[in-house]
From Swiss-Prot:
Protein encoded by which gene: queG
Organism annotation: Lactococcus garvieae (strain Lg2) (Enterococcus seriolicida)
Annotated binding of [4Fe-4S] cluster 2, by residue: C195, C211, C237, C240
MF terms in GO: 4 iron, 4 sulfur cluster binding; epoxyqueuosine reductase activity; metal ion binding
Catalytic residue positions: D131
Protein name stated in the entry: Epoxyqueuosine reductase
């Protein structure tokens, strides 16, 4: 007769969940000093859960919590189809935004997992968390044995590298815990060395304010030092994953809903500037990269056009510089125009 843990492991495999692990719902108190230090240093993004105690104490999310079930689903990092060539230059979304928004996919998986467990074990108390939940997902996953926290701050496993999305069920079930893995980064510092903004601190933490992924998600004017560094990426950044040796040769295609549509993940840049809010939502709204709305994306498109040396964009950029009511778009257009025409700006830049 299979144990409850074995039954849940089989259920997870049947649900196409690539990694599952179990850890006690004990506090993550060892993170407290580091999280406080990061906030005081100005290294946080502002997207983190606000209540520090809730980030560290699972029982504040579920009073009778005993076991946390951590899951990872692997996603593709190489597209099987390329976008067709057109008259327009294309940009790109990072791989974490390919296909359907991973928050939706993970929530469905956790719901299916919880419903399956109920059929096995009867009613139980649980709360599901994905990305924006209270707990630190990578810390939960590492303690549950899914992998280790790399120097890039991401969860890394031998089977799937860091190309995994994480979520967890905090439950009142009593299940034997798994042990952390016995491998790690060793002396490798490739992610730290290749980060173009030196955002990685080298110990698994980062200065989120310097991370290009964060910068592409901000609203308003992007500081000038990051504009050329994003190249033609209009959302996110994958550099610290692409250079990781654990990711070499890995490309997972388990979930059809996460396969990229090349016209969305590598969109034509210039036409994107003419999309209304509704048109943007209709076209890109199912992607994780759309969560901040069209404005940051359109700003990034302007930077990308400048970086791509796309002089065909100059009429549109001049129109934005002269007529757009959004100050950050005017600023971006003037920057791109100067880059393309090598002229002085019309007015001082905001920094």
């Amino acid at each position: 007769m299979k144990s409850l843990k074995e039954e849940i492991q089989k259920l997870a495999a049947d649900l196409n969940i690539q990694k599952i692990g179990f850890t006690k719902a004990d506090d993550f108190e060892y993170l407290r000093a580091s999280l406080i230090e990061q906030k005081e240093a100005g290294h946080t993004s502002g997207f983190e859960h606000k209540n520090l105690d809730e980030r560290l104490q699972p029982k504040l999310s579920l009073e009778d919590a005993k076991t946390i079930i951590s899951i990872g689903i692997a996603y593709p990092n190489k597209a099987e189809e390329k976008p067709e060539k057109t008259e327009y230059r294309r940009g790109s979304f990072s791989r974490g935004s390919w296909g359907e928004d991973y928050h939706h996919v993970l929530r469905r998986k956790l719901k299916e997992l919880a419903e399956g467990i109920e059929k096995i074990a009867g009613d139980f108390n649980y709360t599901a968390m994905v990305d924006t939940g209270a707990l630190v997902d990578v810390a939960v996953a590492a303690r549950a044995g899914l992998g280790f926290v790399g120097k890039n701050g991401l969860l890394v496993s031998k089977e799937y590298g860091s190309w995994m999305f994480l979520g967890e069920l905090v439950t009142n079930l009593d299940i034997e815990e798994d042990q952390p893995v016995d491998y790690g980064c060793g002396s490798c510092t490739r992610c730290v060395d290749f980060c173009p903004t030196k955002a990685l601190l080298g110990d698994g933490r980062l200065n989120a304010q310097r991370c290009l992924s964060y910068q592409t998600q901000t609203r308003g004017v992007m500081p000038e030092e990051y504009r050329e560094k994003i190249k033609t990426v209009i959302y996110g950044c994958d550099i610290c994953q692409v250079v990781c040796p654990y990711n070499k040769g890995i490309n997972s295609h388990f979930h059809p809903e996460m396969e990229p549509d090349p016209d969305l993940t590598n969109p034509e840049l210039l036409p994107l500037l003419d999309l209304s809010n509704k048109e943007f939502a209709n076209k890109f709204g199912n992607m994780a990269g759309s969560w901040r709305g069209k404005n940051p994306i359109q700003r990034n498109v302007v930077y990308a056009l400048g970086n791509a040396n796309d002089r065909s964009a100059l009429p549109k950029l001049h129109d934005i510089a002269e007529n757009d009511v959004r100050d950050y778009m005017v600023d971006a257009a003037e920057w791109a125009i100067e880059k393309l025409e090598n002229k002085h700006r019309m007015r001082p830049r905001k920094r």
